[in-house]
Amino acid sequence: MLNDPLVQEVLFNIFEGDEKGFEVIDVLLEKGETTEEEIAKELGVKLNVVRKLLYKLYDARLVDYKRWKDEDTNWYSYTWLPTLEKLPYVVKKKINELIKDLEKKLEFEKNNMFFFCPNCNVRFTFEEAMDYGFSCPGCGNMLQEFDNSELIKDLEEQIKFLKEELKNNPFLK
């Protein structure tokens, strides 16, 4: 399940690029119910790093926790447990959100004309270019028309790929 490239991509997105998140999941799967302190000790990372990753997993509903009060210290402690049975739902939801975002970008690209500055490598909509008199506000160079047909093609391919993954990926069935 965690070896599926689509699942890995969604988890990577949930962890906001922090690959330690995969190690946290591995420890949770190995130990089942465990404390954040035990995870931090096993991975050799700071407790706040583990907590941040656990909170991200919790926000995605991929872990749950139990809270209890230590009678000696009066501090609350947490034990965490994986709830990865929800992973297919989470992956579908994230992929559908991504498809919607890509479709919005595609619509924007199709419905606008663009110009760019070859010096500064900055792109402008037609309206922005017109406001600047078709000269770059950064360097003063004349703006050139930007052909976004390749970008449109790439967006269409990404959308098609993700829709096919949703339909055909055995993990998401």
Swiss-Prot record:
Residues 3-88 form the HTH TFE/IIEalpha-type domain. SMART domains: TFIIE. Gene3D superfamilies: Winged helix-like DNA-binding domain superfamily/Winged helix DNA-binding domain. Keywords: DNA-binding, Transcription, Transcription regulation. The keyword DNA-binding applies. One of its GO terms (molecular function) is DNA binding. InterPro entries: TF_E_archaea (IPR016481), TFE (IPR039997), TFIIE/TFIIEa_HTH (IPR017919), TFIIE_asu (IPR002853), TFIIEa/SarR/Rpc3_HTH_dom (IPR024550), WH-like_DNA-bd_sf (IPR036388), WH_DNA-bd_sf (IPR036390), Znf_TFIIB (IPR013137). It comes from the Archaea. GO terms for biological process: regulation of DNA-templated transcription; transcription initiation at RNA polymerase II promoter. Monomer. Interaction with RNA polymerase subunits RpoF and RpoE is necessary for Tfe stimulatory transcription activity. Able to interact with RNA polymerase in the absence of Tbp or DNA promoter. Interacts both with the preinitiation and elongation complexes. Belongs to the TFE family. PANTHER family: GENERAL TRANSCRIPTION FACTOR IIE SUBUNIT 1, TRANSCRIPTION INITIATION FACTOR IIE, ALPHA SUBUNIT. Transcription factor that plays a role in the activation of archaeal genes transcribed by RNA polymerase. Facilitates transcription initiation by enhancing TATA-box recognition by TATA-box-binding protein (Tbp), and transcription factor B (Tfb) and RNA polymerase recruitment. Not absolutely required for transcription in vitro, but particularly important in cases where Tbp or Tfb function is not optimal. It dynamically alters the nucleic acid-binding properties of RNA polymerases by stabilizing the initiation complex and destabilizing elongation complexes. The winged helix domain is involved in binding to DNA in the preinitiation complex. This is Transcription factor E. It comes from Methanocaldococcus jannaschii (strain ATCC 43067 / DSM 2661 / JAL-1 / JCM 10045 / NBRC 100440). The lineage of its organism: Archaea, Methanobacteriati, Methanobacteriota, Methanomada group, Methanococci.
